[in-house]
Amino acid sequence: MIGASTTRRIVWSIVAVTGLALGVWPAIAQQTTTPPAEPPKQEEEPFWAIGRPKSGAGAQMAPVPAFPIPTPADKLPIAKMKVPPGFKVEIFAAEVFDARGLRQGDRGTVFVSSLFGAGKIYALVDRGGKREVKVIAEKLMLPNGIEFHKGSLYVATPKAITRYDGIEDKLGNPPEPVTIYDQLPGDVPHGWKFIKIGPDGKLYVPVGAPCNICEPDPDKYAQIRRINLDGSGMEIVARGVRNTVGFDFHPKTGELYFTDNQRDWLSEDMPLDEVNRVTKVGQNFGYPYCHSGMMVDPQFGWGKDCKQFVKPALLIGAHAAPLGMRFYTGKMFPKKYQNAIFLTRHGPWNKTQKYAADVVAIFIDDKGNAKMEPFLTGLVENNQYIGRPADVLVLKDGSLLVSDDHNGAIYRVTYSGK
């Protein structure tokens, strides 16, 4: 039998142990309910890298940076450039950092935009036989798109379009810009613009897809819009447009032709970049469902057929990166180039073998059929870019300007027939 004293000892032992447990439990409970520390956040991939292979050659690919400072005139690759017989390439302007878009004013001023590196708008002015480079706007957000019309310079950023009135009278003291349109999404991916006033007097502006490949709101992205010059009357002219950074209107038909850069990371050799032709307002050119007029997207193309969309007028190479384009309407070049398109191919960054980085001529017959041939080449050497054409401009004298954002330079192509 257990005696009373033994019983009391057992009871007090149980009480003591219970009390200890009750005293320790809040600390244990506190430890177990404290959430674990969050792991360090990983940096998000840049938009261009989403979908990039995780191994192999593709994993090493990234956009090719331009030179961090403009190339001095005596180091520019003029001697490397090849053009057809009778043509000549010369330096028009050097040390124009990040030179992209080109426009000419009524008095001959050449306006130059920039993109990632500079955030500036330049004016090139002839002064006593020398070409002076003036900065007329700076600290802008990706001001790639520019247009000149009736004395005013229009500038497009991802967020808005502004206008600098009477700019050629005020190059030394530029006026405050007037905002005419601020209904742009503002996304950085494919948010940089190319703008042009059409034969209808309206301003055309693209809104690219905010991604490599996705299914964005079709009423907001992947389109070309047009507006009145006061910003009113917005209308969507073309849909299914991933990223156009160049367009122009046929001198005879008035039809809109535009470049389009196709999606990345499907393969090195597909899809092929496009030149497209708008024959009816509201046409759909396929993105993100169909690429190159013949390739259904493996992610978004289920249930779609490329026959549902407008086929490209011309395919111009895988990842060739077509940028600026102009119909030639000058009088200097041979007759074969009249009404032909001069188009810059910036060259791919996501191909192991670099190519393009050139200017091509595109010839269009009366039925809209198009063919392409080289015009200015020679800027790929040892699988490296030594120059990258970005835009073209037909000057009033009929010569052709070519901007090179890689070197921060502008070249002039002339024809003498000799």
Regions found by a protein language model. Name each.
Residues 92-96, 135-139, 180-187, 236-240, ...:
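Surface loop/turn motifs at the tips and blade-to-blade linkers of beta-strand repeat domains
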